[in-house]
Design a protein with these regions (language model features):
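Short hydrophobic beta-strand element within catalytic cores of glycosyltransferases
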Residues: 282-285
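Short alpha-helical donor nucleotide-sugar binding micro-motif in glycosyltransferases
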Residues: 244-245, 252-257
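Nucleotide-activated donor-binding/catalytic signature segment of Leloir-type glycosyltransferases, i.e.
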Residues: 227-245
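Aromatic "clamp/platform" in nucleotide-sugar-dependent glycosyltransferases that forms part
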Residues: 265
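Conserved acidic donor-binding segment of nucleotide-sugar-dependent glycosyltransferases
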Residues: 297-298, 302-309, 318-323
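Conserved donor-binding/catalytic core segment of Leloir-type glycosyltransferases
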Residues: 13, 176-207, 216-218
Length: 364
């Protein structure tokens, strides 16, 4: 009897942040760990970034480069999958890209960043040439939305760019119980990019119409300046700052809140909006990045221009006062999350990218 040869799994070396890092990239990668992706492919994770002091970050980067250099000749991965962003992350990932090219291993560069204009469009000619050169070394770019594909197509051919939307884990929660119909939630890094300095003006208008409304500002960053903005408006009694939340603390906030307010100025495809969709919250956010692909204005939430304090306040007030509208928006948003943004759908698409890139690499 002939013995059927067992097919070798495609080997993936994935360059990732430490699992405890705050932010969207780590959230995406943490969903891969222990998932069906690890059954389908042989995956090795190389951590290249951590939170902490400058020296801790430097030490993690050096250790990451060392681990990667050992992986390439010993394990000979079929594909290197790099998670990157703009700014410092771009420069930290350059050695991984060029080392992969040195060993003739194809590179998938998964770009999570949001500030393309500041990093590339407004950069000097020499910096743009460097960015062009680095991205053209990659065999495939993964971007978060069709809008980002159009932007990156200025640099590399469109057929080398694949849209891979972020995903959300769909909770099985009883949405009709335990939800505070007056609680509004923000989750993210506290600062200017996320629109946090617009929050006091928005909230002043909201509490003038709905005095019982409460705002939870969950996140770290520029907490004290943001808090002072609320204090100057006499609004601190209506606002709580629990700090950065994760795990069950984050689940609890999403499950008990009624409205998700995210007045951001710049995004790729924010994980927190997907999470709010999965929990069926009434969502008020802005028309930036990949958000219009997630939220249909007047159907699954409300979209406003960044900085439109009046518009966002009016939208929040309506969702707090009209339960039926809020529940209709939330129900549609959750349905969209289930149908289009599940982890399973995301992993299936990523798996097809791996197989396509690996095949081309073997033929090269």
């Amino acid at each position: 009897m002939e013995r059927t040869a067992k097919r070798r799994k495609t080997k993936i070396c994935m360059v990732v942040p430490n699992a405890a890092v705050k932010g969207g990239i780590a959230s995406v990668v943490n969903g891969y760990r222990g998932s069906a992706l690890e059954k389908r492919f042989q995956i090795c994770y190389v951590e290249s970034y951590c939170d902490g002091s400058r020296w801790q970050k430097f030490g993690k980067a050096v250790a990451g480069y060392g681990a990667f250099i050992r992986q390439l000749p010993l394990q000979r991965p079929d594909v290197v999958h790099i998670h990157s962003s703009f700014g410092p992350s771009f420069y930290r990932k350059m050695p991984f890209i060029y080392l992969s090219r040195l060993f003739r291993i194809p590179v998938v560069n998964h770009i999570h960043g949001a500030e393309f204009d500041a990093f590339y469009t407004q950069a000097s000619g020499s910096k743009r040439k460097l960015v062009d050169m680095v991205y053209r070394q990659c065999d495939r770019l993964l971007v978060l939305s069709e809008e980002w594909k159009k932007r990156m197509a200025r640099i590399v051919p469109a057929d080398k760019i694949t849209v891979l939307e972020n995903y959300c884990l769909i909770p099985a929660v009883p949405f009709d119980r335990g939800r505070d119909g007056r609680q509004v939630l923000f989750v993210g890094e506290l600062g200017r990019r996320k629109g946090c300095y617009d929050m006091p003006a928005i909230w002043e208008r909201v509490t003038a119409k709905v005095p019982q409304a409460r705002l939870v500002m969950a996140g770290d960053g520029e907490m004290e300046p943001v808090r002072q903005g609320f204090a100057r408006s006499g609004l601190l009694e209506h606002v709580t700052f629990p700090g950065w939340v994760r795990g069950q603390g984050k689940v609890r906030l999403f499950a008990e809140s009624a409205v998700f307010l995210f007045p951001t100025y710049n995004e790729g495809m924010p994980m927190v909006v997907l999470e709010a969709m999965s929990y069926g919250l009434g969502i008020v956010t802005t028309t930036v990045g990949g958000i219009p692909g997630l939220i249909q204005d007047g159907t699954s939430g409300r979209l406003c221009r960044p900085g439109d304090v009046e518009g966002m306040a009016e939208a929040v007030i309506r969702l707090l006062e009209e339960d039926a509208v809020r529940e209709a928006y939330g129900g549609t948003a959750r349905k969209n999350a289930v149908q289009h943004y599940s982890l399973e759908r995301h992993l299936e698409k990523l798996g097809r990218v791996y197989e396509s890139v690996a095949r081309k690499g073997r033929r090269a």
